[in-house]
């Protein structure tokens, strides 16, 4: 949410698995900008919130089956026969889960609108996300380049708009000024922005930012 770093998950997964570990990937900041491929990543767990991809406020978790079967029951003692039972201690929210299907409709409509073709739905949606990425890189590049060249502003994260390296989330700071004062100045200039830690509290603290 701050640095916008796209981590080399597959390389990290290979190293983790080499010593018998499991890797959990938090994709909440990536999923809106890139189509996750858990098989290619070879991760054991992948999580994100579907509201980040224009869906309902529901958490989504993929878990490798072999790891899933090692988990302890989180629900009623008599609901321990299936993952669906032991991972829903209070029972599923049927309406919210059902509304996740709207995500497929949303992407299908965008695919049709842009005339994207492909053999499978995933192929078509992958092409759609590639179009998203190209557009995002195009519109963020001028701002990223301006911040890199600025004599006072400091871009947080990789100094590039390359979508393979960073997501199109842009954070910066100006040494000697508070983020609140920068926010106020930009809002006064009718530039939409925000300030704060954006749930990256430890990162902001480690970077020494306010």
Indicate residue ranges for each PLM-predicted region:
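Pyridoxal 5′-phosphate
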Residues: 1-210
